[in-house]
């Protein structure tokens, strides 16, 4: 019985983390939004079917969750927006 509890606790501690990030438009910039979660959800699901999305208020940009590991998202270190 102790082993079963240990195994279940181990699985709970491991967890499953998915990639998250800002989706990019064709210009390489983040997709803008103003408190419209539904718009962002549609944008995220158009690129990645199983993802979810919401409008990140402080950044005024869409933010996607539950992305596949190979998803290309906006990154400040490789930002090519506007150039």
Curated annotation (Swiss-Prot):
Disulphide connectivity of cysteines: 29-81, 33-55, 40-62, 44-64
Domain of life: Eukaryota
Descriptive protein name: Putative beta-neurotoxin RjAa12f
Family indicated by similarity: Belongs to the long (4 C-C) scorpion toxin superfamily. Sodium channel inhibitor family. Beta subfamily.
PTM per Swiss-Prot/TrEMBL: Contains 4 disulfide bonds.
Record keywords: Disulfide bond, Ion channel impairing toxin, Neurotoxin, Secreted, Signal, Toxin, Voltage-gated sodium channel impairing toxin
SUPFAM superfamilies noted in UniProt: Scorpion toxin-like
Tissue distribution of the protein: Expressed by the venom gland.
GO terms for MF: potassium channel regulator activity; sodium channel inhibitor activity; sodium channel regulator activity; toxin activity
First and last residue of the signal peptide: 1-18
PROSITE patterns: LCN_CSAB
């Amino acid at each position: 019985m102790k082993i079963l509890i240990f195994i279940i606790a181990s699985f709970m501690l491991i967890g499953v983390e998915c990639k998250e990030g800002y989706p990019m438009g064709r210009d390489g910039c983040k997709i803008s939004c103003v408190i419209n979660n539904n718009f962002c959800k549609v944008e995220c699901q158009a690129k990645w079917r199983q993802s979810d999305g919401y409008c990140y208020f402080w950044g005024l940009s869409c933010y996607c969750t539950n992305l596949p590991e190979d998803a290309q998202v906006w990154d400040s270190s490789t930002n090519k927006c506007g150039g």
